[in-house]
Amino acid sequence: MKYFVVALALVAAFACIAESKPAESEHELAEVEEENELADLEDAVWLEHLADLSDLEEARGFFGNTWKKIKGKADKIMLKKAVKIMVKKEGISKEEAQAKVDAMSKKQIRLYLLKYYGKKALQKASEKL
């Protein structure tokens, strides 16, 4: 359970990093404009974008590929967990559970797992009280 939560947190972190864009403030643009003696604000934005382009492409390429690998592995783990939980919870065979999971969308599988682990966490919390 702990590893599953950590893996989901890592996936979310990599997704945020891969899709993040640098914030451009007016102060940064003014500095670029003064350094290059540009009168047009659009030229300053364009120059700043060109300066950061190579670093961003390298970072996004690395995190994008890593993100895809982690996402694929997380999806496989979620499918296996959903089948295992259905077998245990509903008392059906593994083949029947696999057929049910295959019929579900990824969103439905995630919701099913979140409900299951949410109930489990609530039970543990109530036992401690």
Curated annotation (Swiss-Prot):
Q: What is known of its domains?
A: Both the N-terminus (61-94) and the C-terminus (99-129) of the mature peptide form alpha-helices which probably disrupt target cell membranes. The linker region (95-98) probably derives from a processing quadruplet motif (PQM), found in propeptides of many zodatoxins, hinting at a fusion of two originally separate membrane-active peptides.
Q: Which residues form the propeptide?
A: 21-60
Q: Which gene encodes it?
A: cit 1-1
Q: May I ask which residue range the UniProt record assigns to the signal sequence? A: 1-20
Could you say which tissues express the protein in this record? Expressed by the venom gland.
Q: Where in the cell is it found?
A: Secreted
Gene Ontology terms, cellular component aspect?
extracellular region
Q: Which family does it belong to?
A: Belongs to the cationic peptide 06 (cytoinsectotoxin) family.
Protein's name in the database: M-zodatoxin-Lt8a
Q: What does this protein do?
A: Insecticidal, cytolytic and antimicrobial peptide. Has insecticidal activity against the flesh fly S.carnaria, and against the cockroach N.cinerea. Has insecticidal activity against D.melanogaster. Has hemolytic activity against human erythrocytes (EC(50)=6 uM). Has cytolytic activity against insect Sf9 cells (EC(50)=1 uM) and human leukocytes (EC(50)=3 uM).
Organism of origin: Lachesana tarabaevi (Spider)
- List the InterPro entries: Latarcin_precursor
| GO molecular function terms noted in the UniProt entry | toxin activity
Principal location class: secreted
